[in-house]
Amino acid sequence: MSIVKEFREFAMRGNVVDLAVGVIIGAAFGKIVSSLVADIIMPPLGLLIGGIDFKQFAVTLRDAQGDIPAVVMHYGVFIQNVFDFVIVAFAIFMAIKLINRLNRKKEEPAAVPPAPSKEEVLLTQIRDLLKEQNNRI
């Protein structure tokens, strides 16, 4: 079997295609969440705290010296990324919770058939007795 044919079979398997679609949708979802946090959530939060722009929170470890740029820790950007992560994690949690709920409904056991009635039990016993009598003859 040629490598191209093997690769085609591998790539067209359902799980691989599903994974690729998931990665693409996940990347797009990440951009939406980043915009939500940076453009919708953080500005009002900064306003409530006192007109603070979280992106500007930073600590300068060393000032710029000539051609050497300053060494700065931008912890405000880190705070925004934490918000991004929390929102994405919560969205994934809710999606998995929904999928698990749907799977549980599919896996519900079939209804147990009712116990045979007295007549059915009696008829079964009569049938078995007749079989025994026929086997003796």
Curated annotation (Swiss-Prot):
GO molecular function: mechanosensitive monoatomic ion channel activity
Gene3D superfamilies tied to this protein: Large-conductance mechanosensitive channel, MscL, domain 1 (1.10.1200.120)
Protein topology in the membrane: Multi-pass membrane protein
Main location: membrane
Keyword Transmembrane: yes
Keywords: Cell inner membrane, Cell membrane, Ion channel, Ion transport, Membrane, Transmembrane, Transmembrane helix, Transport
Subcellular location(s) of the protein: Cell inner membrane
GO cellular component, one term: plasma membrane
Superkingdom of the organism of origin: Bacteria
Record InterPro entries: Mechanosensitive_channel_CS, MS_channel, MSC/AndL, MscL_channel
Protein's UniProt keywords contain Nucleus: no
Transmembrane regions listed in the UniProt entry: 10-30, 76-96
HAMAP family in the cross-refs: MscL
Quaternary organization: Homopentamer.
Family: Belongs to the MscL family.
Biological role stated in the UniProt entry: Channel that opens in response to stretch forces in the membrane lipid bilayer. May participate in the regulation of osmotic pressure changes within the cell.
Record PANTHER family: LARGE-CONDUCTANCE MECHANOSENSITIVE CHANNEL (PTHR30266:SF2), MECHANOSENSITIVE CHANNEL MSCL (PTHR30266)
Protein name (database record): Large-conductance mechanosensitive channel
High-level lineage: Bacteria, Pseudomonadati, Pseudomonadota, Gammaproteobacteria, Enterobacterales
